[in-house]
Structures are given as C-alpha cells and as structure tokens.
A protein has these predicted regions:
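Bacterial Sec-dependent N-terminal signal peptides
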Residues: 1-26
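Short glycine/proline/serine/threonine-rich loop/turn segments at secondary-structure transition edges
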Residues: 134-137, 177-181, 195-196, 330-350, ...
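Active-site-adjacent substrate/metal-binding segments within catalytic domains
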Residues: 85-130, 134-142, 148-155, 160-161, ...
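Accessory beta-strand-rich segments of carbohydrate-active enzymes
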Residues: 24-35, 52-56, 86, 114-258, ...
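Extended acidic/polar, glycine-enriched regions
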Residues: 178-182, 282-381
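Substrate-binding/catalytic cleft of secreted carbohydrate-active enzymes
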Residues: 430-596, 610-613, 623-637, 641-653, ...
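Extended carbohydrate-recognition surfaces in non-catalytic/accessory domains of CAZymes
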Residues: 23-142, 223-247, 251-256, 380-381, ...
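Carbohydrate-binding surfaces of carbohydrate-active enzymes
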Residues: 281-288, 585-861, 865-875, 884-888
Length: 903
C-alpha cells in the first residue's frame, strides 16, 4: 500500500504539470462529420448569417426562408450570439462594457422593458449546402440553444418552434432540403415572455442588493441575471440575451437514429474494486414506413474488450429506450475499474462508450460518449450537521467557487479553455453553476472531466425572482439539460435553485433521468447554510470569523464567501476613459462595481491607501494587487486551517463568491473579464497547493495543510522573518507529521522581535524528510494592532506605508523561447543578486502595443524573492497571438523594470 500511494503521489504531480502545459485541447463535441453553421463574423465559421428586426419587414417566413431571398439590407449577424452582440458589432450601439455606456440613464442602448419585446425580436438567416454524401439518408438540423422562443423555417417551411433557453431541438429536415444545392434557414427569435423591469422590488434575498430587478424575469426559464445583479450590471443586459446563443449543426443518419446515450456505474463497496455498468440509449425511427424496422444496437467500451448487442423492432415514429443491464450482459461487470478522481485525489481516468445502430447489416448511426467510473455522495453526519461530500468512499473537503457566465453570452472555446485552465491552476476543486446563470457547454464539461473539477448544477430559479409560469416548459428544459450532461463524471450534484425552492416534480424527474447523483432543493438548506461576506472587509476579520454581519460563516458548508480584487492597470485602461481612471470617477467606477456593491471606491480604496497615498492610477493599481492578494490568501488559508476535524470548528466546504467576471468590472477576481490574471490567481494557487505552509495573522502561528489522501512524516517547516532592510531577524523550524487529507495546525509560533521594523516579511519553507523543498510562502506584515471588526486596522490590513522605504533590489533574468505545435513558450529563470528582498514582482507578456497577450498562462506571478533566491517561471500562449509582436517585461516594487523583445 505504501508503494501504491507513493506511485499515486508521483502520478498526481506529473498530471498537474501536464495540465498546466497543455494548451488548445480539442473540443470533442465538435463532430467533424457534422456541418457546423457558425458565422464568419466573430467565430470564423463558414457561414454568412444575416439579421433583421422582424418589425422592419412584412415578408412572411415562407419568403424569408427561400433560397433566392435578397438580404442586401440585412445586417451581418453573430451566430452563436445575441441580438445585442450583433447590433454592437454593426456599431448600432456602443460597447456596453465600456464606461457607463450600458447605464440605463445614459439612454445609449434601449432596454427591452422600456421599448417592448418587438424591439428585440429578430430574424436570423443563412444558407447552406447539403453534400451529396447525405443523399438517401435522413438529414437532421440540431439547434443547441435559443433564447427564448423561436420559429425554425427551412426552404419556405415552418418545421419547429422552440421554447425555453436550455432546450436542444432535433429537426428531421430530410423532406425539405435539396441535396447538392443551396438551402435557406431562417430563425425568428423572440425575447423572453416577461422581460421584467430593472427597477428594484421590495422583496428578495435577505441582506443583499435588490437583485433581479422587479423579479418578473423569473417567470421565464432563462438566464435570470440578464435583468441585473450586483456582480454584473445592476440594470441588466438590454436585450436579455435574445438570440441563437448556442451552436446549430446539420448531420445525417440512416433510417434509424441514436440519441442520448447514458452509462450508469454502480461500485462495489467498501473496496470500490468492481463496477456494474448499465447502458441505455434512445433509438428513433423517423421513417414513414408503416411496417416498422428491425434493427440492432451494438455497444462497446473501447479498449476494454467489452461489447454487447441487442436486436429489436421499432415502429414508425417510435422513440424506444434500449437498455443493457449487467444482469443481462455479465460483461458489463468490470473488475478493478480505473476510477475517476477530482483535483489532488487521483487521476482523471476516462473511458469511451461507442454505440451503433444498424439495419440489415448497414450502420445507420453511431454515437460516442466519454464517461468516468466514480461515486459521489454526501451526507450531514457531521458535528454541526453540515453537508460533507465523499468521492469513492473518501471524504472530500470542498474548496470551490461560484461560476458566473459571460454576461452577454460572448462565448468561445478559447474563453472556456482559458477560464478552466486558470481554475485548475488555482487548486479549486468544485464549480457551482449558480442558479441565475446557465447550463454550460459540452466543452466546459469535457474540460472539467479532464481537469478533475467537480460541478454543482442548479436549474434557473433564485430567491430574488419569481418562479417560471410554465411548469411544463421548465421541466422540459431540465430534462434536455440533464440528458446532455449526465455522462460527465465531473457532474457531482443537482440543486433546484439558488436560495429559493423547487418546482414540484423536480427530484422525481432527476431520479428518473439519472439517479446517480445527490440532490437538494436549494442552495441554502440540507447542511448548507447561507453565505456572506460578499464585499470588501478588513482581511483580519476572516481570521477572527467576523467578516459576515450574519454571524459565524467560517464553519460548516458556506456556498458564498468572497472578496474582490482590482484588475491590473492595463485592464483598467481598457474599460473607461483615462479621465475617469484618475482621480477615480466614483460614478463610473461604482457602475462597473454593481453600483458600488463591493466597495471598490470606498473600503477597498481606503485599504489600498494603507500602503501609502497614490499619485497615479498606475501606483494605485499596483497597490491594489497587494490587497487583492491578501483578500484571497486570508480567505482560503483560514478555511484550510479549519478543514474538516482539524481546526477550531468543523468546516466541510467553501464556495468562493464569485469565480469569474461576467463583464468588465473594477471588482474582478482571479482574472478579469479579458482573461488577464490578477495577483489573486497566484496567491490562491499558492494557498490551495496540495502541500502548503501558511501563517495566521491573528495567532502568529504556522500550520501545514495536506490535500492528498496519504500521510507525510518527518517533514520540516521553517519560518523566517526579515525586517524592512531585508535582515533576517527570526528563524525557527519544526518537525511536522502530516495526516492524510489533514492539517498540522499551529506547528510553530513566530515570535516577532521587539523593535522590529513597522513593516516586515515572513518566508515559510516546507521540506520533505530528505531536505527537498516542497513549497514556500511569503507574507508582508505590519506592527499595527488589530482593533476590531469595525476598524480597518491590523497586521494584514494597515500600516504598510513604510514599504516605500524598501531599498532597491536587483533581479538577474535569463530566458529561452521554444515552440511546440501551435504553442509558444518562454522559460524564464530569475535570481535575486542583491542583499535586499525583491518585493512583489510581476512578469508581463506584452504585444507591440504594450497590451497583455491574452490568454497567456504563467506558472507563477506577483512573487517576492529573498536575497539570493532563484525562481523559474514558464509563460505559454498560442502562436497565433503573436502577430503583433511579443515583449517580456519584469517589474516590481523595488527593482528597475526590464524589457526584452522576443518577436
């Protein structure tokens, strides 16, 4: 067993390294045998989409969807996309994410609540050719998502109506398309039935801003945050994201088609050494023959020497569910299965299931899906009745966050990949799909499977909005979504709503469709308490557990607990005019902060000023990164300390509020909307590394956290303290034995010498029993006394003005560039050659315009180097991002900037 865990540990480290150097992963959902009708505009697809306001033409759908219909007066359209996205692209309206352009009082972009639904009701149209290879087959048109209702016309024929944002529709267009010729597709898209008003209501979730406008947006099954929320625009998105927001594709099958394959795993306990697999798939006979069809479905688990088949008859128009059970097919009992594990707990083993259906020996259709074998359960058998999760029988401490979708659905594979790669780098292990958002893409779930990220899925109801008025529509959207995502091992938990209730029948439907995952009615029940804090507080309050006005929140399972970070100065310059940046224009900054919700122009600014008053936006933004780093580090490390049974109180999980920025905002998180990381990403990644030494600003103690399912004995943690002149004034070490998935709390106490400088620094080093450094950590601290939660005082919060007295340091930098496939790497080695600490250094990868190349992936950033210390960092980006040149920059608090032209 000892050799096994050593091997597992090595595998985990190798996997972690490979994850962070594997760019441009293929989107497996993009079947190359399909015709994908992506627009030329924005998506670089092959199809010219056009759009026109429905009220601006009197032509009927029959005419608009004819192949010779003139569209010279129509506008280019973005598909997938929304009406407003296309109107902004065509310069009909200004960029909503800039300054106060979107502010309803600015009257630059009409709000649907004021101009009515017809204003944003649009026709979308394109033409496509059906290849000769489709001749004699059934041709299908698949629409993955339209918001909110739609008429689908092909060659003059109304073939379908779509209702609800999360429905996948499959339309048999065989009798209506022309093989080898141009065909016309026209989709008339209607906005949500009840757009709601951005005016606040008198009711809502306790202690929060007036989110969700007047609440009526909730009468629809849609993306509820479009009417306004405090983490985005409080006055919402003007068209409520009306449009064809997901892909449209065309494919062909034989007489019989397959859809919605599902594979269920039942693991034998307690050893989890055997899996019983149950496979099911829907078989669709869309032929017009009255005689029915004899067909055969064959299946295999690829590479495992497991195959199975079944013959049966499907009558005209029948949609038959065919099931293969392990009782009927013993080969579906798998011994010693390779289990799937989340971040840090084991490898992300995945299998492929392939199914075909044939008639008279000729294959009509095939489907393939990936799956993982694992069991995820939870219970409330804890000291405080809080919910705790288990993976494959082992307890899992949740270090999660709340995923927020892009506000205007400006999605791309590049954005999805970058955000999930940053997520994996951060060490987070679960993403909550917050109930006012969306159900994410197949590519999103594919990457979560590969990266070991668990997903908590909610279903589009919140406590700030009313409930859907059409229950059948809501339930059909839930059904469509569950069938789409249920094979993903990353999908861990179902929750009906955010801070609300459930639609009657939801748990029964989920059990019928899946039955392998846990469920709770809403996000704050059944062992999950209510959240907070949400905005800036004194970082000392996290250690004291007084950060929330609702009382203790560092305990049990907290679904929403977080703090903001200022974006970097380059990004701030992209979101508003220079005159609004400095001095800070409170109106503009507050609008880009959910009407000031996160206190960026008040408390955040006050705390930044504790590093010394700034004279420019550049100086303010640099200091703002220091505060953002402390915000993230203090939250994660206090939860580390209280992990499960090891701290002052029982904690089973935290979901940081919130994960990603839905639009440009001055209150960002680990990265901003433009995919440029902040200091919070790297300080979160440090805090959530699997073996981690950390300092408590309130207790002055050092603890060591272990996130692996194995113990580590005879490790050594060392604490060093340096004064403002970089003299080492304290050093002490302690031996630590790290329990499996546990914490060695208060391993040593730092005794700060009398007369130590007002500002000083702490370096923590963790070494294994052979003396090899495993991890390190770095803090800045002041002598200020913490005077309580109503103040902005304390050694993590105030008294940092003397940082300006840091003497100059020198860092020697060397780099090498290399190319692998489509990717470009810069391998950087740095060494502090001076006797002074090089404080808070930032590497930048810039283009010729001195703008950050995005997305780029840095293995570390915003770091400090003690005298003589060495560090290596690798930066990676796609080669296609280098068309405007590339420059490497190193800058820091007390070093001279260095610039190197790379291309």
């Amino acid at each position: 067993m000892h050799n096994f865990v050593k091997t597992l540990f090595s595998v985990l480290l190798l996997f972690f390294c490979s994850v962070l150097t594997a760019q441009n992963r293929m989107n497996d959902a993009r079947d190359p045998n399909r015709i994908w009708l992506d627009s030329e505009v924005t998506h670089h697809g092959d199809y010219q989409w056009k759009m026109m306001k429905a009220g601006d033409t009197t032509d009927p759908g029959e005419k608009i969807s004819s192949s010779d219909y003139p569209t010279e007066k129509w506008l280019p359209a973005i598909v997938p996309g929304t009406v407003l996205n296309s109107l902004v692209y065509n310069q009909k309206y200004p960029e909503p994410y800039y300054g106060v352009n979107n502010k309803i009082e600015s009257k630059l972009i009409p709000d649907i609540s004021q101009v009515g639904r017809d204003f944003y009701t649009y026709w979308f149209r394109t033409e496509f050719a059906v290849p000769q290879s489709f001749k004699g087959k059934n041709v299908w048109l698949q629409l993955d998502g339209i918001n909110y209702r739609a008429e689908v016309w092909v060659n003059g024929n109304l073939l379908s109506t779509i209702n609800g944002m999360f429905i996948q529709d499959y339309i048999n267009v065989t009798d209506f398309v022309k093989i080898g010729k141009n065909n016309a597709l026209a989709v008339k898209v209607y906005p949500v039935d009840v757009p709601g008003s951005t005016k606040p209501k008198s009711w809502g979730a306790a202690g929060e801003f007036h989110n969700g406008g007047n609440g009526n947006i909730g009468l629809n099954t849609t993306m509820l945050m479009t009417v306004g929320w405090d983490f985005t625009f409080m006055d919402g998105i003007r068209d409520r994201n009306t449009g064809i927001w997901k892909n449209i594709s065309i494919y062909a099958t034989g007489k019989v088609a397959l859809r919605h394959p599902f594979i269920k795993s039942e693991l034998r306990k307690p050893d989890y050494d055997q899996a019983r697999e149950t496979v099911s798939v829907e078989v669709i006979n869309s032929s017009t023959s009255n005689s029915g069809i004899n067909c055969k479905v064959k299946g295999e688990i690829v590479g495992e020497n497991i195959s199975f088949e079944k013959s049966f008859r499907v009558i005209r128009g029948e949609q038959k569910l065919v099931t293969f059970s392990p009782e009927e097919f013993p080969q579906l009992v798998m011994n010693s299965p390779r289990l799937w594990w989340p971040v840090n707990k084991g490898p992300q083993n995945l299998y492929d299931l392939k199914l075909t259906v044939s008639v008279d020996g000729v294959i009509c259709d095939s489907v393939k899906t990936r799956f993982g074998i694992r069991e995820i359960t939870s219970d409330t058998k804890t000291p405080d009745k809080s919910r705790v999760f288990y993976v494959n029988g082992k307890r899992l401490f949740i270090r999660g966050t709340n995923w927020i979708p892009e506000a205007m659905l400006r999605h791309s594979d590049e954005r999805t990949y970058a955000e999930l790669r940053y997520t994996r780098q951060s060490g987070v292990n679960l993403l909550r799909m917050w109930g006012g958002g969306i159900a994410e893409s197949d590519y999103f779930f594919q990457l979560c499977d590969e990266l070991g990220l668990l997903v908590w899925q909610e279903f589009w109801m919140t406590g700030d909005t009313r409930h859907p008025h059409d229950k059948a529509l809501y339930m059909s959207n839930v059904e469509s979504t569950v069938k789409r995502i249920r094979n993903h091992p990353s999908l861990a938990y179902y929750v009906a709503s955010n801070e609300s209730t459930e639609m009657t029948g939801t748990p029964e439907l989920l059990n019928q469709l899946d039955g392998t995952r846990g469920y709770q009615m809403q996000s704050e029940c059944a062992g999950v308490h209510d959240g907070s804090p949400y905005k800036q507080v004194n970082p000392m309050q996290h250690y004291e557990n007084t950060a929330s006005p609702r009382g203790s929140r560092v305990d049990g399972f907290n679904p929403e607990y977080g703090a903001p970070t200022l974006p970097t100065v380059e990004i701030l310059r992209e979101m508003m005019d220079e005159k609004d940046l400095w001095p800070i224009n409170k109106e503009v900054w507050d609008y880009l902060d959910g009407n000031g919700f996160h206190l960026m122009t008040t408390m955040y600014t006050d705390l930044v000023n504790h590093y010394g008053k700034s004279s420019s936006i550049d100086e303010f933004a640099q200091k703002g990164q220091l505060l953002g780093a402390i915000n993230s580090k203090s939250i994660w490390e206090v939860w580390n300390y209280n992990k499960l049974d090891y701290g002052d109180r029982f904690c089973s999980g935290l979901l940081f509020w919130y994960h990603n920025c839905s639009m440009r905002q001055v209150a960002s998180r680990m990265w901003d909307w433009s995919l440029e990381p902040t200091a919070s990403l790297y300080h979160t990644a440090n805090s959530l590394e699997p073996l981690h030494a950390q300092f408590d600003y309130l207790k002055n103690t050092v603890s060591v956290v272990n996130d692996f399912y194995r113990s580590f004995d005879n490790y050594k943690v060392t604490a060093q303290v340096y004064d403002i002149n970089s003299r080492k004034v304290f050093e002490e070490s302690a031996a630590v034995n790290l329990p499996a998935d546990g914490v060695a709390n208060d391993a040593l106490t730092i005794r700060f010498p009398d007369g130590i400088s007002q500002v000083h620094f702490i370096k923590l080093i963790l070494k294994d029993k052979k003396g090899k450094e495993i991890s390190s950590n770095f803090y800045w601290r002041s002598n200020d006394k913490y005077e309580g939660k109503t103040t902005l005082t304390g050694p993590a919060a105030s008294g940092f003005e003397d940082l300006s007295k840091l003497r100059a340091s020198k860092v020697k930098l060397a780099y090498k560039v290399r190319e692998e496939g489509d990717n470009y790497f810069v391998d950087i080695t740095m060494r502090n050659t001076s006797n002074q600490i090089a404080f808070f250094n930032q590497l930048q990868f810039l283009n010729a315009k001195m703008s950050p190349i995005r997305p780029s992936f840095y293995t570390d950033n915003f770091f400090s180097l003690t005298p003589g210390e060495k560090k290596t960092v690798t930066i990676e980006t796609a080669k296609e991002k280098l068309s405007e040149g590339a420059m490497l920059v190193l800058k820091g608090w007390n070093i001279d900037s260095q610039k190197y032209k790379l291309k």
